[in-house]
Amino acid sequence: MLKDTIAAIATPAGTGGIGIVRISGSEAASILNLLFKSSHSVTLFKPRYLYHGDLSDPQTGQVIDEVLVSLMKAPRSYTGEDTLEIYCHGGILVLESVLLAVLRSGARLADPGEFTRRAFLNDRIDLTQAEAVGDVIMARTSKGLEAAVSHLKGQLKQKIDSLRDELIDVQVLLESAIDFTEDVEFPSPSEVLSKLERLSSDLEALLSTYDQGKVYRHGATVVIAGKPNTGKSSLLNCLLQEKRAIVTPVPGTTRDFIEEAISIQGVSVRMIDTAGIHPTDDLIECEGIRMVWEKLATADGVILLLDGSKDLTDEDRKILKRLQGYNLLPVINKADLDHSLKEEDIIACFPGTDPLWVSAKFGEGIAVLKEKIYDLVLEKAGEQDGDVLINSLRHKMALEKTRQQVSQALASLQEGLSQEFAALDIREALEALGEIAGETVTEDILDRIFSSFCIGK
């Protein structure tokens, strides 16, 4: 329903100095003339100018607030339609009253993300940029914001366009040979195969950025695990620089998970303090320990916390053996006490690791630990040096489908099958790739994407 006019409050709920009501559609200018009276008796409003005056209720004529207004004419607006923004005082009642006046004047309440959806449908932005709008709003760390702004500026779209151009080049070569076999000299098979192999490599390189992009967008989860009384809760408090977990000398104080996010070098890392792992007949403790192993199985990284003031026991060695194969960082706590634990025993269990000594009590080694946590989660994600990352499962699935079709085209040509089979694969690859920027996307996918937006954006 792009022909109707929509409106919504565009600023967050709550009180503030300024609030914004946004209107988009063909009736935006009419609504402005109906509700607004300029303090300088202006009746013809120039686009992109700010005007000061009173905004009144259309039914009673009562002044609602003293406001500023700005009209932006299609197509040079965010949505590509006539757009009106009303800047009023940021009180809840004021904003609701202004919005109600606008709705009474012919607009309807916008759906979540409908302004950005209209921007996409009116070719102001592509779908990767539309998704990036939501990511910019929801970004909680500098890396997440950096990745979102990259997409908003069109860098992912440029990469997708480049891949699309390469696919079209191959498609032209194949289909020309099919349609004009007598008039067109078909390029050597090695030339087409070379182009397809390069395409496959480029697609693989972009796909390999997904894990890193996902960490930047959603953050990572790191579980602190170990025996009771190794200082897991103290370490969590030290990393957070606040007393979040209860710390006592009594082993087994922590039974439930305690989770809190911290920002490490621009990446959001959710730290999880867990119950101590040890043999027990206590049913509650047994259930807590079972849940610890479930958390460990889904974590992006594990901090194995050991007590440096004690030698390894047989019980310790059983836990260490079970943790082999995890993305793990051995950390030895209580560096402020006499060292009894031997590093070589830890390295023997986890070859290639470099155990880090810390003192959660005095903060010793915590700065280095944060650096190692960053390396731990980014190393698993496969940190990339390129400028463009994908961070959406939707993008990943579309790229995987594209790569699959390119691989099938390669196989067809290598097996000496008709060029028509390869041409069909390339057409399907183009369709899959077009889903990313929205060229071949369905209404269901659009509904799913924009339903996660806030109203007013």
Swiss-Prot record:
Provide the transmembrane region boundaries.
none
Its EC number(s): 3.6.-.-
Q: Which residues bind GTP?
A: 229-234, 248-254, 273-276, 333-336
Q: Which GO terms describe its cellular component?
A: cytosol
Q: What PROSITE patterns does the record tag this protein with?
A: G_TRME
The UniProt record lists the keyword Transmembrane: no
> Which positions make up the signal peptide?
none
State how the cofactor is bound: Binds 1 potassium ion per subunit.
The record ties this protein, via NCBIfam families, to:
mnmE_trmE_thdF, PRK05291.1-3, small_GTP
Q: Its quaternary structure?
A: Homodimer. Heterotetramer of two MnmE and two MnmG subunits.
Name of protein: tRNA modification GTPase MnmE
* Source organism of the structure: Syntrophus aciditrophicus (strain SB)
Its taxonomic placement starts with: Bacteria, Pseudomonadati, Thermodesulfobacteriota, Syntrophia, Syntrophales
